[in-house]
Amino acid sequence: MYGGKSAEHNVSLQTALAVIKALNTEKFDIHPIYITEKGEWVRGARLTEPVSNVKMLQFEQGGSAFSPAALNQEMFPQEASQQNEAIDVVFPLLHGPNGEDGTIQGMLELLNIPYVGNGVLASSAGMDKVVMKHLFAQVGLAQAKYAAFLKKDWTRSPKESCEEVEQELGYPCFVKPANLGSSVGISKCRNREELQKAFELAFQYDRKVVVEEGINGREIEIGVLGNDDPKCSVVGEIAPKTDFYDYKAKYEDGDTDLMIPAIVTDEEYATISDMAIKAFKAIDGSGLVRADFFLTADGEVLINEVNTMPGFTPFSMFPLLWKEAGVEYADLIEQLVELAKERHAEKQLIKHTF
């Protein structure tokens, strides 16, 4: 399942292409579900031939629209009615709002269909950077100072919003839409003029914005895999050649060095992995999470955020971290499918009557 009504639509297509290429077609029957930028659901025929580009996944010809409310029946109209066949697992490869934020996960829960990755709570908390930061604070995770603003606050008094940032955080700072990933709508600000422009940009993508103090430190990331007993990968480091790791550097230029594994001490790795698992449990994670940190020159570790559906593009950090840890891409995907089935089976044991 990929695409979606989100600013990260194209990222999702790239992720879907990479995952589909890696799936073992002798082991899995692959049925693509494309959600257009307008939010329309289109299903394609079972994939029996290799997919070489994202255009093939957009079904400009040959796809058929369907209602997501009857997902099993739409995908297997005859078989499902006879209860001979149904969807085993949905793999949501959706990024951003209307996909990674708990909405799709809620629908799949109502339909009682197993799905890869985080549930409703973890997905929504992981999408909203403000809620996420509140949860991290509650479990005692060190993080950079931040402030949150609603669009109505900015509209009412841009001057007050800017003054609050300057007094509480100072420059440089980073302005981000609260509910977007892939560095969409993010700006680095060094003065009032840049801050005003950054607010205006971020509010184009969300009604809520978070502003974070700038941290002078290395950008370290780690992968978390599992359900109630999660494990961590090696750590990696992002060294962007640009001013910061924005959308263009991530997905277009490749103008970033990924150092895997990152050079850290045993003590620093222990701290990072422990904090990553605490963050995973704080949002009630399942399946996978990529946790992002800052590591300062004096060894202080600050959590930045978690991503509940990290990218699976060929140059994405999450699969590369696990590859370095000894888990190949195709095996990683199969583990995620098994974790989805495990979590779903556990939920089926829950009583709903008393």
From Swiss-Prot:
Residues reported in the UniProt entry to bind Mg(2+) 2? E305, N307
Cofactor binding note from Swiss-Prot or TrEMBL:
Binds 2 magnesium or manganese ions per subunit.
Instruction: Give the domain of life.
Output: Bacteria
Tell me what reaction this enzyme catalyses. Answer: 2 D-alanine + ATP = D-alanyl-D-alanine + ADP + phosphate + H(+)
Tell me, what is one Gene Ontology molecular-function annotation carried by this entry? D-alanine-D-alanine ligase activity
Keyword Manganese in record: yes
The broad enzyme category this protein falls into is ligase
- Gene this protein is translated from: ddl
UniProt-recorded name of the protein: D-alanine--D-alanine ligase
Q: Which organism is it from?
A: Bacillus subtilis (strain 168)
The job of this chain, per UniProt, is described as: Cell wall formation.
InterPro entries the UniProt entry points to: ATP-grasp (IPR011761), ATP_grasp_subdomain_1 (IPR013815), D-Ala_lig_Van_CS (IPR000291), D_ala_D_ala (IPR005905), Dala_Dala_lig_C (IPR011095), Dala_Dala_lig_N (IPR011127), PreATP-grasp_dom_sf (IPR016185)
Question: EC number(s) in its UniProt entry?
Answer: 6.3.2.4
Pfam families listed in its UniProt record: Dala_Dala_lig_C, Dala_Dala_lig_N
Q: Which UniProt keywords apply?
A: ATP-binding, Cell shape, Cell wall biogenesis/degradation, Cytoplasm, Ligase, Magnesium, Manganese, Metal-binding, Nucleotide-binding, Peptidoglycan synthesis
Q: In which pathway does it act?
A: Cell wall biogenesis; peptidoglycan biosynthesis
- Family annotation (PANTHER family): D-ALANINE--D-ALANINE LIGASE, D-ALANINE--D-ALANINE LIGASE A
